[in-house]
Design a protein with these regions (language model features):
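Short Gly/Pro-enriched loop/turn and capping motifs at secondary-structure junctions
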Residues: 109-110, 155-158
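Short, well-ordered beta-strand elements
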Residues: 140, 146-155
C-alpha cells in the first residue's frame, strides 16, 4: 500500500493528459501484444525482449568488466567508456531519470531525494547502469563493483513499477560482495 500511495499523485496528474497508445491493438490485446507478429518484427529491444536471465547476466558481466569476460573481448574499452559517458537528466513520463549518451539508465541513490517516484526507482541501485522492464525484469551492471546482474521473472507483475523483486536480489548480491571484500 505504501508503494501505491507513492505513485498515485503522479498518476492523477497524468490522467488529464491521455496519449494515444503507441501501437494499434494494445487496448484489445493488452500484454499479449508483445507476442504479436507485428511487435516481433519491430524488434523493439526495450519491450518484449525474448531472452533468459542467464544470457542477460553474461552480457551484463561483459559490460561491468570493461567490455570483456572469460577471455572474450566483445566491446573495446574505449567503446565501453563511451557507452557509459555523459549522463544527462531528463523527464521520462512521470519522473526524472538519468541516461548516458548511449541510452543507458544510470541509477543514483541521491536522486531519491527528488521525490517518491525517483526514490523507488533509484534507491538501492546506486552506481548501476542498464534497464528494467515491465513486470519486474532487471538487466543492469555496476562497473566499479564489477557486478553483472539480471533477473527475469516467470510471472509478469505489471504493478511492480519499481521492479522491487529484482531489486531485493540485486541488494543481496551487493551485500554478499561487500561482505567478501
Amino acid at each position: 500500500f505504501a508503494r501505491g500511495r507513492r505513485i498515485l499523485p503522479a498518476i492523477r496528474r497524468r490522467q488529464g493528459t491521455r496519449q494515444p497508445l503507441p501501437l494499434s491493438g494494445m487496448q484489445e490485446e493488452g500484454f499479449g501484444v508483445f507476442d504479436s507478429a507485428e511487435w516481433l518484427q519491430a524488434q523493439t529491444p526495450s519491450a518484449g525482449a525474448k531472452c533468459s536471465a542467464r544470457g542477460l547476466a553474461k552480457l551484463a558481466a561483459v559490460m561491468a568488466n570493461g567490455g570483456s569476460a572469460h577471455g572474450h573481448q566483445l566491446l573495446t574499452e574505449s567503446g565501453c567508456a563511451a557507452l557509459h559517458a555523459e549522463p544527462i537528466e531528463r523527464k521520462m513520463t512521470i519522473m526524472d531519470n538519468r541516461f548516458t549518451q548511449a541510452g543507458l539508465a544510470l541509477f543514483d541513490d541521491a536522486d531519491g531525494a527528488k521525490g517518491p517516484l525517483e526514490a523507488g526507482m533509484n534507491c538501492g541501485r546506486d552506481g548501476f547502469y542498464g534497464w528494467m522492464g515491465l513486470g519486474g525484469s532487471v538487466f543492469q551492471w555496476h562497473p566499479r563493483k564489477r557486478i553483472g546482474f539480471a533477473y527475469v521473472p516467470t510471472a509478469l507483475n505489471p504493478i511492480d513499477l519499481f521492479n522491487e523483486r529484482g531489486k531485493s536480489y540485486q541488494k543481496a548480491v551487493v551485500q554478499c560482495l561487500d561482505t567478501m571484500s
